[in-house]
């Protein structure tokens, strides 16, 4: 909003696909379906590539955005697994995870992350945990959303001057 940029999130696209394929839980969809149907990853990846070619000045919320839209400011937000799980549970708009407690949410988050890392390494030989792929890596575990935005915004502004 601050920069007036459009936002495209591949997570949103993946959630739409999971519902289309009859899954109410994104982790179950990733583990059971996407792992054995790589064409789903390719669908999402192609959408990223096309979006990057057809648009300028946008935000792409994507694990592999740095790979498919290389001419970009590449920012990675990281967070402690327990805090990330708590945030997922607290997000009332998020309806594609079945976890109802912190332990289940942590387990689902870890399983989802491990599955994505394995799939991306297998498909593209890209390690999503390699921070050298990014211009900025920011640990948001103890930051409010306002504090995280301020730090990211300062970094973006410093790159655009």
Predicted segment positions?
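A conserved segment at the C-terminal end of the G1
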Residues: 1-5
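ATP-dependent small-molecule kinase phosphotransfer cores
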Residues: 8-69, 82-83, 93-97, 114
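Short, amphipathic alpha-helical "lid/cap" segments that border enzyme active or binding sites
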Residues: 45, 145-153
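Short, well-ordered alpha-helix to beta-strand connector turns
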Residues: 55, 71-72, 134-135
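Conserved phosphate-donor/acceptor-positioning beta-strand/loop module used by diverse small-molecule
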Residues: 71-111
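Small-molecule kinase domains that catalyze NTP-dependent phosphoryl transfer to phosphate-bearing small molecules
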Residues: 97-148
């Amino acid at each position: 909003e601050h920069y007036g940029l459009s936002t495209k999130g591949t997570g949103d696209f993946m959630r739409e696909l999971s519902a289309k394929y009859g899954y109410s839980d994104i982790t179950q969809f990733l583990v059971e379906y996407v792992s054995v149907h790589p064409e789903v990853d390719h669908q999402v990846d192609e959408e990223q590539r096309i979006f990057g070619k057809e648009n300028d000045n946008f935000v792409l919320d994507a694990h592999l955005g740095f790979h498919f839209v290389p001419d970009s400011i590449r920012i990675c937000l990281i967070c402690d697994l327990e805090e990330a799980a708590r945030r997922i549970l607290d997000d009332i708009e998020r309806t594609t995870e079945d976890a109802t407690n912190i332990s289940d949410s942590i387990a689902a988050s870890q399983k989802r992350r491990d599955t994505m890392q394995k799939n991306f390494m297998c498909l593209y030989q890209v390690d999503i945990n390699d921070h050298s792929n990014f211009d900025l890596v920011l640990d948001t575990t103890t930051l409010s959303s306002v504090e995280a935005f301020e730090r990211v915004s300062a970094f973006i502004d410093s790159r655009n001057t």
